[in-house]
Amino acid sequence: MITVRAPATSANLGSGFDVFGAALERPADILRIEKANRTTIRVTGVGSKYIPEDPEKNTVGAVAEALDAPAHIEIDKGVRPASGLGSSAASAAAAAVGLNELYDRGLSREELVPIAAEGEAVVSGAAHADNVAPSIMGGFTVAREDGVTQVDASIPLVACLPEIVVSTRDARGVVPEAAPMEAVVDVVGNAATLAVGMARDDPALVGRGMEDSIVTPERAELINGYETVRSAAENAGATGVTISGAGPTVIAACHRGDRTAIASAMLDAFSEAGVEARAYKTEIGRGAELF
């Protein structure tokens, strides 16, 4: 048997729609995997009752099929489904890394990314790598069709998860089909700023680079209290605030000493909007780990 821990992730980060992603130190999924004649899955943990154990309907089953690596896989969910924190990606990433090791497939971490992305497509409907890439490789990632660029970073973050469900499919439904050139230019500049900030480990630059005027405003309408929470986080010291992935998690970049105040402010703001929430004081960290 092999045990794998794969982290939650934050995709998009505002200006990097479908391209940027970051691994979070917490929360995480833990998978226990052992060889078998056919793939079977057991799911426990956060939101497990909403996750199918049928291998044909579960991300890890698709990964096992792609690697020709049948196994009994126990998934302990630490990342809530429909949270905007890459829940299905964490399981797919852990399965890819664990099965690659267990069956001695010899694939690199980067080579595992498209396999895990195909697995995640079972849930999200499309093979996007912006979550699986950082969950496998760690740090900050830029996922393109021709490969992944990865940068180690340790930017402090607060991820505030409200008790609201926003599915990836619903969130994609509000994405504009086109945008004014002025907005596109602004977002390109912000994305470049964020990438430089990651390379420099500079929370101020990362926060500035999170600004987005195309996708985020549309998705914000799906999150009750978003603008109030964003303002509260900024007033408490956040350098930037945006929606994590498809939402509803709201993520704030900050300096390390401000995380507690920001987390408290975001929780209070959601509470004022009548929404219960949980805050993770975290940071950009490692990818999937074998035990």
Curated annotation (Swiss-Prot):
Q: In which pathway does it act?
A: Amino-acid biosynthesis; L-threonine biosynthesis; L-threonine from L-aspartate: step 4/5
Q: Which InterPro entries match?
A: GHMP_kinase_C_dom (IPR013750), GHMP_kinase_C_sf (IPR036554), GHMP_kinase_N_dom (IPR006204), Homoserine_kinase (IPR000870), Ribosomal_Su5_D2-typ_SF (IPR020568), Ribsml_uS5_D2-typ_fold_subgr (IPR014721)
Where does it live in the cell?
A: Cytoplasm
Q: Name one GO cellular component term.
A: cytoplasm
EC number(s) per entry? 2.7.1.39
A single GO BP annotation from the record?
threonine biosynthetic process
Q: Record's superkingdom? A: Archaea
Question: In the record, what terms sit under GO molecular function?
Answer: ATP binding; homoserine kinase activity
The UniProt keywords, alphabetically, are: Amino-acid biosynthesis, ATP-binding, Cytoplasm, Kinase, Nucleotide-binding, Threonine biosynthesis, Transferase
Q: Name one Pfam family in it.
A: GHMP_kinases_N
Function, as annotated, reads: Catalyzes the ATP-dependent phosphorylation of L-homoserine to L-homoserine phosphate.
- NCBIfam families linked to this entry: PRK01212.1-4 (NF002288), thrB (TIGR00191)
Family listed: Belongs to the GHMP kinase family. Homoserine kinase subfamily.
Name this polypeptide is given: Homoserine kinase
**Organism encoding this protein:** Natronomonas pharaonis (strain ATCC 35678 / DSM 2160 / CIP 103997 / JCM 8858 / NBRC 14720 / NCIMB 2260 / Gabara)
